């Protein structure tokens, strides 16, 4: 069987529709979302409600705490274990979410062709200790494409990218793009007309504020430092600036909406890279028809 990945831009309406389908076909949901993976970050990541999660079992939501390290490689390891467990139990695994790097980790895997060089890794690590930021500068120089994908604080992946470059003379970003897409997966992208999608984004942000996003951020800052990677994401970074009196709440809300719209555009651009993906525009068909088409896509052999 082929495994189904259902994706689409934020606020397109994936959760609502997939929940209904999953309950009809004995499916569980494996979240493909790099923010919903965090515990305590509920409102700002638009997690499914307790009621929604009670209807269908979800995995990789509330998986780690905000100060724990996690990346696409770890996601792949966890997701494949869960996938195989569900298949053995006769349950359909549905991968649902819009984090591009996580989707890539499933359909393309990771380049692992260069053996580890512990001596080189130690030397690079020492360089970073003596001159913080030097590895980032080197990566931007030798492999700018990889630098765009790797977070500045992700020293492990930075060292790996530099290790590959120094051992082979080739950029890890080029070697990764040469890998073929797995035939084990099929991708379905849900979309909407832009004006409708952006209106849904705006309404969802307003809903987050009403549900207590500001208090959620305050509570998080009582437990964790503000500079965690998890807090440098849309919805959290803007509210943190508001709490620091950098700007007022109206400005923070405006920026969350604006930044979310920009993020949705980037997601759409990323998803267009998957030439084999099927697209369904939810603005053009009824909910009933959409559910029929999605269910048919999932169950196709």
Swiss-Prot record:
Substrate binds at residues 10-15. InterPro entries: Dimethylallyltransferase, IPT, P-loop_NTPase. It is an enzyme of class 2 (transferase). ATP binds at residues 8-15. Keywords: ATP-binding, Magnesium, Nucleotide-binding, Transferase, tRNA processing. Signal peptide: none annotated. Its EC number is 2.5.1.75. The record marks 99, 121 as: Interaction with substrate tRNA. It holds the Pfam family IPPT. One of its GO terms (molecular function) is tRNA dimethylallyltransferase activity. GO terms for biological process: tRNA modification. Gene3D superfamilies: 1.10.20.140, P-loop containing nucleotide triphosphate hydrolases. It comes from the Bacteria. It catalyses: adenosine(37) in tRNA + dimethylallyl diphosphate = N(6)-dimethylallyladenosine(37) in tRNA + diphosphate. Residues 33-36 are annotated as: Interaction with substrate tRNA. Catalyzes the transfer of a dimethylallyl group onto the adenine at position 37 in tRNAs that read codons beginning with uridine, leading to the formation of N6-(dimethylallyl)adenosine (i(6)A). Monomer. PANTHER family: TRNA DIMETHYLALLYLTRANSFERASE (PTHR11088:SF60). NCBIfam families: miaA. Belongs to the IPP transferase family. This is tRNA dimethylallyltransferase. It comes from Thermosipho africanus (strain TCF52B). The gene is miaA.
């Amino acid at each position: 069987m082929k495994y189904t990945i259902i994706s689409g831009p934020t606020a397109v309406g994936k959760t609502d529709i997939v929940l209904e389908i999953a309950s009809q076909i004995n499916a569980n949901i494996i979240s493909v979302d790099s923010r919903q993976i965090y515990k305590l970050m509920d409102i700002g990541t638009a997690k499914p409600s307790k009621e929604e999660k009670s209807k269908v079992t979800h995995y990789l939501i509330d998986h780690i705490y905000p100060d724990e390290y996690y990346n696409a490689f770890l996601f792949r390891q966890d997701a494949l274990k869960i996938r195989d467990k569900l298949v053995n139990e006769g349950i359909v695994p549905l991968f649902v979410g819009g984090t591009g790097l996580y989707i890539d980790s499933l359909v393309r895997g990771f380049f692992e062709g260069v053996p580890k060089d512990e001596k080189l890794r130690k030397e690079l690590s020492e360089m970073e200790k003596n001159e913080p930021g030097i590895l980032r500068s080197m990566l931007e120089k030798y492999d700018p494409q990889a630098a765009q994908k790797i977070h500045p604080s992700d020293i492990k992946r930075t060292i790996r990218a530099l290790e590959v470059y120094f051992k082979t003379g080739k950029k890890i970003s080029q070697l990764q793009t040469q890998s073929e897409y797995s035939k084990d997966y099929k991708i379905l992208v849900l979309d909407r007309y832009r004006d409708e999608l952006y209106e849904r984004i705006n309404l969802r942000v307003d809903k987050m504020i009403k549900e207590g996003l500001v208090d959620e951020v305050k509570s998080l800052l009582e437990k964790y430092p503000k500079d965690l990677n998890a807090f440098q994401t849309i919805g959290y970074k803007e509210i943190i600036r508001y709490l620091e009196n950098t700007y007022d709440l109206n400005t923070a809300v405006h920026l969350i909406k604006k930044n979310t719209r920009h993020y949705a555009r980037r997601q759409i651009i990323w998803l267009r890279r998957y030439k084999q993906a099927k697209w369904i525009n939810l603005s053009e068909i009824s909910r009933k028809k959409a559910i029929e088409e999605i269910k048919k896509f999932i169950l196709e052999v």
